[in-house]
Amino acid sequence: MERGLWRAGSVPGHVRLAFGRTGEGPEPLLALHGITAQHRAFNAVARHLRHPDGMVALDLRGRGDSEKPPPGNYGLDAHARDAIRTLDHLGLERGILVGHSMGAFVALQAALLHPDRVRALVLLDGGWPRPEEASDADEAAIQEGLERAFGRLDMVFETPEDYLDFWFPDQNLTLEDLPPDLADYYFYDLARVDGGFVPKAFREAAEEDAGSVFSESPTAAELEGVGCPVALVRAAEGFFPGTDPLISDEARDVMAQALDLRSERLLSEANHYTMLLLEEYARQTASVIRDFLRRLG
């Protein structure tokens, strides 16, 4: 199901990284997806954004069509190095990084470790400060949300429609029933194997990365070391409808104090996933990014 939005490319090296690219310009945005996703999560945002230089959306190591090294090769530092390696491959001295969910933490880590290489950051419902002492309730809420996403990674689905039934139970959907951007996202998420289809994301990679986010992401004090301009887009709901947002108002205030926050928006009816995957919210997300880029000049 190739829709023509992305041109496939790869970053060579000790871990080969796959990416999709839109546009032809010399300074594309670099987009980094969430913990079990892949670059097609940015389908709708990239299409609505129409950035003049385009977008390069990476399949993080262990996801999509990128290589999947064994456990011990993941974590925020490894992904941040991959982001910089991608900038090198693209010939970009300094890049604008757009990160959703875990991708936002990767973008922050890249800005902290390589401040001379990151011009600006767009954080999409991720990158909140790691508390000095995490509460059991907060960790449990995030773990509960991740469990559903992680659970599918060990499953074999007889058909793509069975995969849709996992996400949309009892709706009997086919790929043709979904908006094209969303259908393409779910189809690309699958690899064909004997007996059916499996999600491309490597579970051990996701688990290692979750541990890295919980234990190694920046604290509020460390966020103050990010020297570049930042845009923040938050979803009003968490992983599921009716759940608390992942970035609370209190966490947002801490981020606003620590970071050079130039643009922000709260998507009032979106959740952590729909802010990218559903048309109406992806359009709003793209609008914030466009406004932020205009302000950067």
For each of these PLM feature ranges, what is it?
Residues 56, 60-98, 270:
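Active-site loop/oxyanion-hole signature of alpha/beta-hydrolase fold enzymes
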Residues 93-136:
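Conserved hydrolase catalytic core segment
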Residues 20-68:
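Conserved HGGG/HGGXW glycine-rich cap/lid loop of the alpha/beta-hydrolase fold
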Residues 12-22:
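A short loop-to-beta-strand scaffold at the N-terminal edge of the catalytic core in hydrolase folds
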Residues 256-269:
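Catalytic histidine neighborhood in serine/cysteine hydrolases
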Residues 267-280:
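Catalytic histidine-centered segment of alpha/beta-hydrolase-like enzymes
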Residues 131-200, 206-217:
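Helix-rich cap/lid subdomain of alpha/beta-hydrolase
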Residues 191-258:
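Conserved serine/cysteine hydrolase catalytic core
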